[in-house]
Amino acid sequence: MLPRVLLAEESLPFRRVIREALTAFRDCEVDDTPNGEHAFELALRRPYSLFLFALPLAEMDGHLLDRLIAKAYPLAHPGVHTAPPVIFLIRAEEAARFHQIQRDARVRGHLPMPPKLDALLTLTEGLLPPKPNGGGFPKFSLAPDVP
């Protein structure tokens, strides 16, 4: 079974970039949602290997979402003793706030927004397996095929 990632971020373009990058370079599946309430429901419904939560979310703060899931996740998934690790998606103005919450052992870092591929792959290295055969985005060429 492939590892599954839960991504909660309000911006559809950012969710799309992160989802496409992870599925291109990591051997995983990604569920994404724009709001914290739906993320909470998904976390209780399915097992996950990693959470990626934006600090500001509609309806619920990303840190609060993580705290609630950390308490409920082991109850919803028998045999699991702790919730998966979390990476927070932060904007520049949230950097000071992130430093206050990074002490939690499950917090594996932060991804500055807008997302950058190298930062995302560095943060997920060791948390998600690499795609077989290196993965990557499809190769396109504008040059005509030469026999």
Put a short name on every predicted segment.
Residues H81-T82, P129-P147:
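CheY-like receiver
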Residues D32-L50:
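Acidic, metal-coordinating helix/loop segments flanking the phosphotransfer/catalytic sites
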Residues E9:
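Conserved acidic carboxylate
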Residues L52-T82, R97:
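Conserved phosphotransfer microenvironments
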